Each structure stands twice: as C-alpha cells, then as structure tokens.
C-alpha cells in the first residue's frame, strides 16, 4: 500500500523507506508531528518502575526483593556496581515528581507496585504493610489531584526474596497462588481510584534474562561453554548486561518455559479475580505489557522470512498468543516440543481472552535470518533456529544509542503495530514504553547533559510511524515515554540515561532538571504560552541531610 506517496512507501513485507528526493520531506514531516494529529482522548504519559526509582529499600516495613538481594550481594552483576537502595528517591520525592508531571502536561503516569513493599513476607498470612499501602495511596491521590491518570503495573520484576528462597519463585507453580493473593490486595486497596491495571511487565525479559542469560536474578541459565553466544543474546534487549562469573546454573532448555508458563497463569488468574469480583463495581480495565524487538528478514528468501516470524513468535507471541487464542504459537510447539508446557483445558479457557488491552514496549529492531544448525544442547536461545544482526551488508539497521543493544529504528514500531492488528484480532493497544538512552558521561556538566536532541528526534520519529499505523486502522489508545526520569537501568545500573528529566546523582540530592526533550514534550502537549519548566533546587533540607548520612 502507498502511504503519503510523496514522503513514504510501505508495502507488505517491506521496510518503510523515503521516496522524496533527499529524505528531507520525510524528516520535516516527522518534525512537524503535533498533539492534534492524535485523537483528543489519546493518552500521553510517562513510565517508571518501583525498583528503578523508589529507593527506600528497607523503609516503611518493606521486605527484601530479589533485586535488593542480587544487587547488594553480587554488585559485580551491575555494570557500574550500583544498586537501587536509594535509586532516585521517588519514595520520598513523589510529591515534587507529580508536580513535574503536571508541568510537563502529562495525562497519565504508569508506575509499578513493589510486591515486598505491600507484602513484606510475600503473602497475606505474614501481614500487609500499612506504610507500603499508604505510600501508594498517597501517590495515587496526588496524581488524581493533578488530573493525572494512574496506570498501575502489578509486577515489574521485583518478587519478595523470601518467596524466591522458599520455593524458587516463578520457577515453581506455588507462585500462582501467592500472586493471586497479592493481586487481589492491590485491587482491594487501590481499585476504587485506579482504572487501568497491567498484570505483568515484559515477562519475556524477566524470563530470558533471569533463566537463560543469567543477567537478572536469580541468575540462572547457561553453562560455562555457552557464554559467548549467550552473552550476545543477553544484549539484544533492554536491561541485558554482563554475565556473572558465579551465577547459578539452571537449565536454559526447560526452565524459561516453566517460568513463562507460570507467569501466564499468574496473569490469567489475576484477570479472572478482577473480572469476577472487582471490575463491575470499580469500572476499570486490565491487560498485560509485553516487549518486542521487531525481527526484520535479513534477506528476501523464504527461509529468512519464516525465521523472522519465528523470532517474533519466540518473543512477543510467546506471551500474547496464549492470551488471545489459549495456545502457544505453532512455531514454538513445533521447535520446543515436549519441553513446552501445555495448558489444561480449564487453564486454556482461563487464559484465552484474558485482556482488555495489550501493552507494548518497543525500543528497537533487528535483522533476522534462518539458522539451520542443529544445536548440541537444548536452550531457548537456539530453539527458534534464528540468527540476529544489527547490520545488513555492513549497513547498520539504524543509529546506535547509548546501549549496545539499542539501535534507533522508528519504522519498526509501525511493523509491530500492523502485524499485531493482523495476527491478534485487532486488539486495543497502548505503547507502554518507548524511549532511547545516552551514556551517562560523567565528564559532562549538568547543563551539557540537558542537551538531548537525540531523544527529541527519537520520539518525533516514533510518533510519526505510530500515527501511520493508526491511519491504517491499528487501535492504539496511548503512548508512554520511557522514561520520565533517569533511573536505575537494571544490569546497566546508572551507566545510561533514559529520562526526559535529568537526575543529578552526583550532588547527593537527586535534583530533577528538565532536558531539552522535556521542554519539547511540554510544548507538544500544551499551549506554547505555557509556563516554562524551572530548574528548582530541592526544598527539603531534611532530605538532603538524610541522603548525605548527616544529622
């Protein structure tokens, strides 16, 4: 099909390309993207996650999470040896942070709840933390007072460490019962004001980085002889980092499929509880967020086209197809065989249709080709029989950002959206994360670090291609920036910055300053005459003293 023929050509199975004489027409069109190009009820927001921003790891009765334990006991697993003990101190600074959101013109804030902050002992029988519940109540109330809609993620990778130690966390089916209990507490405590729920964030990342690559807790996966290939795969998506020298070996050919299966059942049961007991009275919606690095065929061969489809199946389809159809993708059933768990008839009915919307986190794309090599051992990384590359004929798929896995490929978001509409029954979609990082260059002054034109262009171009997909009938309802603030980026620690708001880690006060991209978003979302953002110092001397460790 031809879309805006003077600017762009997109045909089925092809990569969008400029058709203007020098590409300048396309560039200028993207730069002119504006709020009014989207429906008036289209939601623009920003996103964070509990461990990445809250800090206060042992305040208010909070229990230890798997990430608390991992980063504090094995600091070598984080590229800069940092942790989220303080993170960016959102726990103590949330009121000021809501003011920032309001000034930016955001209408929604997506954040996650910390399971061990609400249930320090992992389950209800060990008690609910009143302080933890109060923190989230205060945050929700502050958002609503600022006319900002809360979008809550129930689980964004921080399981109570006590459950990890007791039975292996998501590797054991016992986690389903505990997750149901935790989810219901969330619905009960916050559902009167929260109208958008996300059960899980990127179950693919949690599963693969934790149980195949060994880069996330519980650091299970490969054996020593697998390290070179696994290191390559570990860097293919956000958050992947270096492998630990002493991580715990598991079985990368079976464990990820068990973990994923339990995650899907956790999701489905939580949705069932919400729909059965809370949705009618509370009037909310519930879904799941998944990630996709779009797999583009390396060549026009049928083998590579099929491989690209498998690549998408083994990442996005692994978790989306079950909630849409009740079954895993056919390619996974074929290539994984008996190692892929099966849903019982009852579970299939529970899982199928367990969503009101689908969240998508999109950052990048990759070239994919067929790999007919027969592996010597079973592993998720080789089960799809695919090879990935960020180059075609020595030409990168896009400009590289701060992380070695993130290449800027705006047209990939269009491909994902159109493919989802076609394959998954035209679902309601929210872009729950989209963003780009820069290296945290400590030699730069804070003033220099605020100049992030790369981020402005990244968002302009992705919004442009997202709008093209919407013009083709894709039912996208919202877009969330990753991230609102610079924060702790998992295995990358504080070595990269994703925020539109700069966080000054060095001054000990975690001062927030608007980058150029924040100003761009402000202008995009509000009237040109809006009051500009100001670089105001922190107001709380007590907070400064506490963070410095003084009295």
Curated annotation (Swiss-Prot):
Tissue: Expressed in expanding leaves and in young drupes, mostly in the developing seed coat tissues, the perisperm and the mesocarp. Also detected in shoot and root meristems, flower buds, developing ovaries and tapetal cells of the anther. Not detected in embryos or endosperm, or in leaf trichomes.
GO biological process, one term: protein complex oligomerization
Keywords of this entry: Glycosidase, Hydrolase, Nucleus, Plant defense
Short motif Nuclear localization signal, span: 542-550
Complexes and interactors: Homomultimer. Native form of the enzyme requires at least an octamer conformation.
UniProt-listed Pfam families: Glyco_hydro_1
GO CC annotation terms, alphabetical: nucleus
Binding positions (a beta-D-glucoside): 52, 156, 201-202, 363, 433, 482, 489-490, 498
EC number: 3.2.1.206
Active site per the UniProt annotation: 202 (proton donor), 433 (nucleophile)
Compartments where found: Nucleus
Broad enzyme group: hydrolase
Organism in which the protein naturally occurs: Olea europaea (Common olive)
Thermal dependence of activity, per record: Optimum temperature is 37 degrees Celsius.
Region Required for the homomultimerization, annotated ranges: 502-551
GO molecular function: beta-glucosidase activity
Biased amino acid composition, Polar residues: 1-27
Residue ranges, compositional bias (Basic and acidic residues): 535-544
Record carries keyword Flavoprotein: no
Domain of life: Eukaryota
Noted pH dependence of activity: Optimum pH is 5.5.
Name of the protein this chain belongs to: Oleuropein beta-glucosidase
């Amino acid at each position: 099909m031809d879309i805006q023929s003077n600017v762009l050509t997109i045909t089925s199975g092809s990569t969008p390309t400029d058709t203007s004489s020098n590409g300048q027409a396309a560039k200028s069109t993207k730069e002119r993207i504006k709020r009014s190009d989207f429906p008036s009820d289209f939601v623009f927001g920003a996103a964070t996650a509990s461990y990445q921003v809250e800090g206060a790891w042992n305040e208010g009765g909070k229990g230890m999470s798997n990430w608390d334990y991992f980063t504090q006991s094995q600091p070598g697993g984080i590229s800069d040896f940092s942790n989220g003990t303080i993170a960016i101190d959102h726990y103590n600074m949330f009121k000021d942070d809501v003011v920032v959101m309001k000034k930016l013109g955001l209408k929604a804030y997506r954040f996650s709840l910390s399971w061990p902050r609400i249930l320090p002992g992992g389950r209800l029988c060990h008690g609910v933390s009143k302080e933890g519940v109060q923190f989230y109540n205060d945050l929700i109330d502050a958002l609503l007072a600022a006319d900002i809609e809360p979008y809550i993620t129930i689980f964004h990778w921080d399981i109570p460490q006590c459950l990890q130690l007791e039975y292996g966390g998501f590797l054991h089916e016992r986690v389903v019962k505990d997750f149901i209990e935790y989810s219901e507490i969330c619905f009960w405590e916050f559902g009167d004001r929260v109208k958008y729920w996300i059960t899980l964030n990127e179950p693919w990342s949690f599963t693969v980085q934790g149980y195949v690559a060994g880069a996330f807790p519980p650091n299970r996966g490969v054996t020593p002889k697998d390290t070179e290939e696994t290191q390559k795969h570990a860097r293919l998506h956000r958050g992947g980092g270096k492998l630990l020298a002493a991580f715990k070996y598991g079985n990368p050919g079976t464990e990820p499929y068990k973990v994923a299966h339990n995650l899907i059942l956790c999701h489905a049961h939580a949705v069932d509880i919400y729909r059965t007991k809370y949705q009618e009275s509370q009037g909310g919606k519930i879904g799941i967020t998944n990630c996709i690095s779009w797999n583009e065929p390396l060549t026009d061969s049928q083998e590579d086209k099929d491989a690209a489809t498998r690549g998408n199946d083994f990442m996005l389809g692994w978790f989306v197809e079950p909630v849409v159809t009740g079954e895993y993708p056919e390619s996974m059933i074929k290539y994984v065989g008996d190692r892929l768990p099966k849903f019982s008839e009852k579970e299939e009915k529970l899982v199928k249709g367990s969503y009101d919307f689908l969240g998508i986190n999109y950052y990048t794309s990759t070239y994919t080709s067929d790999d007919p090599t027969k592996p010597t051992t079973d592993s998720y990384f080789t089960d799809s029989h695919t090879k990935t590359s960020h180059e075609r004929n020595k030409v990168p798929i896009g400009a590289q950002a701060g992380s070695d896995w993130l290449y800027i490929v705006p047209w990939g978001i269009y491909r994902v959206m159109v493919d989802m509409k076609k394959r998954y029954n035209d679902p309601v979609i929210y872009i729950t994360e989209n963003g780009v990082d820069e290296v945290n260059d400590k030699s730069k002054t804070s003033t220099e670090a605020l100049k992030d034109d790369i981020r402005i262009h990244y968002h302009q171009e992705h919004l442009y291609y997202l709008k093209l997909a919407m013009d083709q009938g894709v039912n996208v309802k919202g877009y969330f920036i990753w991230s609102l603030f610079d924060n702790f980026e998992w295995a990358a620690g504080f070595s990269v910055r994703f925020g539109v708001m700069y966080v000054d880690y060095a001054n000990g006060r975690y001062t927030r300053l608007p980058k150029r991209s924040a100003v761009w978003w402000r202008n995009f979302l509000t009237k040109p005459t809006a009051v500009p953002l100001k670089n105001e110092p922190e107001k709380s001397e007590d907070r400064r003293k506490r963070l410095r460790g003084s009295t």
